[in-house]
């Protein structure tokens, strides 16, 4: 983790992986166990590895907690993403520079779900197919986009995977729903761009709250208070 000096919190430099209690890496292309079945699975972050997609907000929160950390707040996450220049993009500009971060791959008409399911219904099963994040030129290893960073030294906060934060929607018809920031590699900037990109989870099943929504695009990283080290 690195310290964000302006806000006095620590954050993982890279998107996280998940590990089982015995230290075995969880397959990053497959949905992790739900929190009630998850036990001591924990989060770690390294450069040059495949980050965990297919993860829900509560799964991510528990993995951070089991590692002695916590999910970042939206304010913390955006502060780390914007860097000391407080820019819209981590590399210090207020406009997108093509190729700096892993975004805008595969336009809607070429979405990888449609490649696998030409008559896609966009079901939970389809959106969590482990093959999606294994396509060439799709999900990248952590830190692969070496220019997708800032002076704090955090990578991939825009693109690659969108990342769950601790905050929930506070009002309106989606009150209590989970929030993911930063967009993902197939994101087209529909819900703002750069560090302002924001997606709100949907309730996709009456027995599972939005905090358990997950698909190929959802990942996370952890934060911590400096005094916890």
Description of each model-found segment:
Residues 4, 157, 224-225:
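Active-site beta-strand termini and strand-to-loop segments that position acidic
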Residues 15, 165-169, 226:
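Short beta-strand segments enriched in hydrophobic/aromatic residues
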Residues 2-85, 96, 132-152:
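Short aromatic-cysteine micro-motif
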Residues 112-158:
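Short, well-ordered junction/capping motifs at the entry into regular secondary structure
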Residues 17-18, 50-58, 62, 68-72, ...:
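Disulfide-stabilized, aromatic/cysteine-rich ligand-recognition loop
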Residues 10-12, 70-72, 88-90, 153-156, ...:
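Structural recognition of the beta-strand scaffold that forms the well-ordered cores
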Residues 61, 77-119, 164-186:
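An exposed tryptophan-centered "aromatic clamp" motif
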Residues 138, 144-146, 157-163, 167-169, ...:
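Hydrophobic, well-ordered secondary-structure scaffolds
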């Amino acid at each position: 983790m690195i310290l964000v000096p302006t806000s006095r919190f620590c954050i993982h430099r890279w998107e996280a992986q998940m590990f089982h209690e015995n230290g075995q890496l969880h397959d990053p292309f497959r949905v992790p166990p739900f929190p009630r079945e998850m036990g001591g699975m924990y989060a770690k972050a390294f450069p040059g590895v495949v980050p965990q997609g297919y993860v829900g907000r509560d799964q991510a929160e528990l993995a951070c907690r089991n590692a002695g950390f916590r999910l970042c707040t939206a304010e913390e996450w955006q502060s780390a993403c914007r860097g000391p220049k407080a820019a819209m993009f981590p590399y210090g500009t207020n406009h997108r520079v093509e190729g700096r971060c892993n975004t805008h791959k595969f336009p809607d008409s070429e979405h990888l779900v449609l490649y696998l399911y030409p008559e896609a219904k966009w079901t939970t099963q389809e959106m969590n197919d482990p093959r999606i994040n294994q396509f060439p030129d799709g999900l990248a290893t952590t830190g692969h986009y070496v220019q997708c960073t800032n002076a704090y030294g955090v990578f991939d906060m825009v693109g690659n995977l969108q990342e769950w934060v601790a905050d929930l929607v506070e009002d309106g018809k989606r009150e209590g729903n989970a929030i993911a920031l930063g967009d993902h590699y197939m994101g087209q900037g529909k819900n703002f761009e750069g560090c302002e990109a924001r997606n709100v989870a949907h309730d996709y099943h009456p027995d599972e709250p939005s905090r358990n929504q997950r698909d190929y695009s959802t990942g996370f990283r952890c934060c911590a208070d400096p005094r916890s080290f």
